[in-house]
Amino acid sequence: DSLANDDSLTDDQKKQVKELQKQLSDAQQQEKQQEENSQKKAEQRDAFSKKMDELESDDLKISSAENQEDELAMTASSFEQWDNLLSEMYDYLATVLNADQYASEEASYKQWVQERDSGAENAAKETEDDTAKQLASYSFKQSYTKTHCYKLLDLMN
């Protein structure tokens, strides 16, 4: 500030000093905003990671199901939870990716859903029993969805 008020400078030089000070101030503000955005992204990524850890912990209980019906119910519930988390992750990505990036992600998501559902159908075909068919289908969907959640988490780096 003292430079801008220095009487030995011409009006033109004072104007240049003020412009440079404004540019510096703007750059500092922009850097601060970027740091805040990076921190928010890291916090959101950590929140997703924590939720995934909780779901993984819950998934460990599936192996202790007393019978196939309980295993089916637990696996179906797990799939729903992973699928909900996946939706939350896509909702978040919609806020941080640019339009082209998100459009690309959205297109790959639609293809991914088709692959997931097709894989689940194929898994179910490999058994005759209705409960076993449903279990195979949900197990495939749960595993495939879980893997996709981890891929999206990596995208958030």
Predicted features by range, described:
Residues 1-157:
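N-terminal alpha-helical modules
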